């Protein structure tokens, strides 16, 4: 049985407003703690990819890679609107990190569409 729910609009449904805001608040805290404007400019100037920040985003405390994975499989159960909202907030911080985050989200699609129990 495929994981994908065939119900119309399922990919848009996603998180309830409170949960979405909680994830957005987490992104804001990440920015405040790790992504000052000076640090982002330093990444650009030195042509550094901030691997440690990506690892933090994907770590057990934040787990942003779980956004689009259904809750039944350990994810957050987010939808396209959630991905858009979070990507938009991240783009205000750093496009490089946003691109990495969105690329990681693309990896959820094959799991949702083709994985079996």
Language model features: what each stretch is:
Residues 98-117:
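N-terminal glycine-rich flavin-associated loop
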